[in-house]
Structures are given as structure tokens and as C-alpha cells.
Amino acid sequence: MIKVLFVCHGNICRSTMAQYVMQDLVTRHGLAEHFYINSAATSMEEIGNPVHRGTRAKLKEVGIPCGDHRAVQMQRSDYDKYDYIIGMDSWNCRNMMRILGKDPEGKVSLLLDYTDHPRDIADPWYTGNFDATYDDVKAGCEALLTHIQETEGRK
């Protein structure tokens, strides 16, 4: 079982979008039984809140259900629970390391680091552009899945 945790600031926009996009990808590839995919926040600001309406609307538009997710905060213990801990931007990664303390196994990375265009994914909470965020998240999740298939296939 490959365990992936997507992380952003509040766990209501980007990380949740990545969680559901990745779940859709592995399901469509017939790999769902090999993956456990979740998401979390670095902050406590949105804990308990549902998926942002903009994220929910974009996922619905592309035919991806997003369930009844509620925001949770990342914990230090998550390091031992997940194989991949994926941040949406550099600020998230700094805060993830503050929570985790260290990354001896190299589990922490940015989602778009798996693409040919590594960079931060803009937060639609501020930009209002859920289309651009979805495009980045989709590209990142597709590249991450390819990376996992190539890496895990060699083990």
C-alpha cells in the first residue's frame, strides 16, 4: 500500500483538490487498492471546515466527487504513516518541516517538483482562480503517479 498525504495551508482548497484528483487517477488506472490518499493542513485556521466551494465546484465540473472531507491539521506522527508527503508551495513545505522536525527518508516534496515545470501552486483562496489551480494539481498528480509507478516498480 502506497500512502500519500497532500498538504496545504488550510486543507480546504489545494491539498483537498489534490487528494480527490489523485484518487480519481488511481481509480481510473485500476490502482485504487494499492493507494491510501489523504490530505491535511499546516495551520489550524480551517480545522473542521468542509471543502471550499470553489474547489468543490471545479471538481464537480470535471466529474470528480469530493465527499464530505473536513479539514484536519498535519501531525508529527504523519511522517511514519505516509510514504509521500506532498506540499503545494514552498511556504507549506517550510511549515511541514516545522511540524515534522526532519525528513530523514526524503518523503517531503512539492507536487510540481514531479513535473517538467517545478514551482509553487498558487492558492485559489487568494487568487480566486480554481481553474489554474486544478490544471497545476492535475499535472502534478499525473507526474507523481508516473514517478510512483516507476519508483515502486523498481523495488
Regions from the PLM with identified roles:
Residues 1-81, 146-155:
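Conserved active-site segments centered on acidic
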Residues 8, 59, 86-87, 137:
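Hydrophobic structural packing positions in well-ordered secondary structure
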Residues 78, 84, 90-155:
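Phosphate-binding/catalytic loops
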